[in-house]
């Protein structure tokens, strides 16, 4: 049975990229087998998340990793962590009311994406700096306030030509005790 025919959903050939809104990407057979095996038993999800995070962090040579259900979910989680800064449950419980926290995100992006909405959903305030224009490191630094918690760089080919290099932005973030978030974005579709 074809589930998409049953639901009357049109299928297509994805010749663009692994984009969440277009079904992301197809799963490898190994992944499908692991999911089938995992579905036969019950586990404590928090324990599973921690174990999988450790494994992915090792595989990707990172200090930590966390599995989410797409870009927007990942940015929402990252935004919450950037605002709270410390693993204190009572601070997370305040969200999405982040008015007492450092809750401003300097967002360098070329166009509207799910990233800005995810930041707002977590309780953050978006400060657009490079929306469709050239921007210098000084422009970004001028946008930093005592309420700023992170610089978020949504990389596209066009934006990378209009903004300071990622390394310079990261050093600026560290200089001001800010988190630096990087989101690699596919280029927009033209029809």
What are these regions (language model features)?
Residues 1-22, 26, 53-67, 72-191:
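Conserved PLP-enzyme active-site core in the AAT-like
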Residues 14-51:
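A glycine-/small-polar-enriched, mobile loop at the entrance of the PLP active site in fold-type I
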């Amino acid at each position: 049975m074809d589930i998409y025919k049953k639901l009357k959903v049109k299928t297509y050939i994805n010749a663009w990229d692994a984009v969440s809104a277009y079904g992301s990407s197809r799963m490898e057979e190994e992944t499908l087998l692991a999911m089938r095996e995992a579905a036969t038993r019950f586990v404590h999800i928090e324990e599973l998340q921690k174990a999988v995070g450790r494994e992915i962090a090792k595989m990707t040579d990172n200090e930590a990793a966390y599995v989410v259900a797409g870009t927007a979910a990942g940015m929402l989680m990252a935004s919450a962590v950037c605002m709270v800064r410390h693993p204190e449950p009572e601070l997370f419980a305040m969200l999405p009311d982040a008015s007492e926290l450092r809750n401003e995100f300097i967002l360098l992006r070329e166009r509207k994406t799910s990233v800005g909405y995810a930041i707002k959903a977590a309780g953050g305030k978006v400060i657009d700096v490079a929306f469709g224009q050239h921007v210098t490191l000084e422009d970004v630094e001028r946008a930093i306030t005592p309420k700023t918690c992170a610089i978020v760089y949504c990389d596209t080919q066009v934006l990378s030509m209009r903004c300071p290099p990622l390394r310079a932005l990261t050093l600026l973030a560290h200089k001001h005790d800010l988190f630096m978030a990087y989101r690699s974005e596919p280029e927009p579709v033209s029809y």
